């Protein structure tokens, strides 16, 4: 009998993409439920009463919240298929450090890039570029962030790639030209079926964000 696994998510969420990628890497069957973020479902509010946000992974009726925690949970449940965390304790700690860095350093500036204008957007641009420089340096000449194996840090960051065009268009950023190593890394990740299935089309993301800025925020 198959385990019941439900993912409450939103198609454009780079955080939900992490969980989708992890599930696909492990070849785990699950039920995907799209959430309307302007009218959150009773199930979402019940399963994540503290933060009331996606993604929420529901395993046999039990909720697991926060995407990086979900990815590690999935890796622990199915350790034999495409391991996400390295077996070496130090390397595992390093992977967790960089995943945490991505979470702590990207959320505020990335949201401001598309939801703000003027000085706030300019400040967000500077902050995000510094993050990209740091990650570019950490990647170096490695195939993936952890070396030759696709892992936690790759999963933590690759979802942002689907938003890069949006950041470039709405915030006048130059990411593709300025960070060729990160772009090459993203293309390598996209060759994996799990990533290709999880990441939405960048044009779709741009249109959604542009519509939101114009209609809801009144920003061109």
Swiss-Prot record:
- This protein's species is Arabidopsis thaliana (Mouse-ear cress)
Could you tell me the EC number(s) of this protein?
2.5.1.18
Q: What family classification does the UniProt entry report for this protein?
A: Belongs to the GST superfamily. Tau family.
Q: Which reactions are catalysed by this chain?
A: RX + glutathione = an S-substituted glutathione + a halide anion + H(+)
Concerning PANTHER family, the annotation shows: GLUTATHIONE S-TRANSFERASE U23, GLUTATHIONE S-TRANSFERASE, GST, SUPERFAMILY, GST DOMAIN CONTAINING
Where does this protein chiefly localize?
Answer: cytoplasm
Q: Where is the GST N-terminal domain?
A: 3-82
- Which UniProt keyword terms apply here? Cytoplasm, Detoxification, Transferase
Protein name (Swiss-Prot/TrEMBL): Glutathione S-transferase U23
Q: Which residues form the GST C-terminal domain?
A: 88-208
Which gene holds the coding sequence for this protein?
GSTU23
* One biological process term in Gene Ontology: toxin catabolic process
């Amino acid at each position: 009998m198959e385990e019941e696994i439900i993912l409450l998510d939103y198609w454009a969420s780079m955080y939900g993409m992490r969980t989708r990628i992890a599930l696909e890497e492990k070849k785990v069957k699950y039920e995907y439920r799209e959430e309307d973020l302007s009218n959150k479902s009773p199930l979402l509010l019940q399963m994540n009463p503290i933060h009331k946000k996606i993604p929420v992974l529901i395993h046999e009726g039990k909720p697991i919240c926060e995407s990086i925690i979900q990815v590690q949970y999935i890796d622990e449940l199915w350790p034999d298929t495409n391991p996400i965390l390295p077996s070496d304790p130090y390397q595992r700690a390093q992977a967790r450090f960089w995943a945490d860095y991505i979470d702590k350093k990207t959320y505020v500036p990335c949201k401001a890039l598309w939801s703000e204008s003027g000085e706030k957007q300019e400040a967000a641009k500077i902050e995000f570029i510094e993050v990209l420089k740091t990650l570019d340096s950490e990647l170096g000449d490695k195939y993936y962030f952890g070396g030759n194996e696709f892992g936690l840090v790759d999963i933590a960051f690759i979802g942002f790639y689907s938003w890069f065009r949006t950041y470039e268009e709405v915030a006048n950023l130059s990411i593709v030209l300025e960070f060729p190593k990160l772009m090459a890394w993203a293309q390598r990740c996209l060759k994996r079926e799990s990533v290709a299935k999880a990441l939405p089309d960048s044009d779709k993301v741009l249109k959604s964000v542009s519509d939101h800025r114009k209609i809801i925020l009144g920003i061109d």
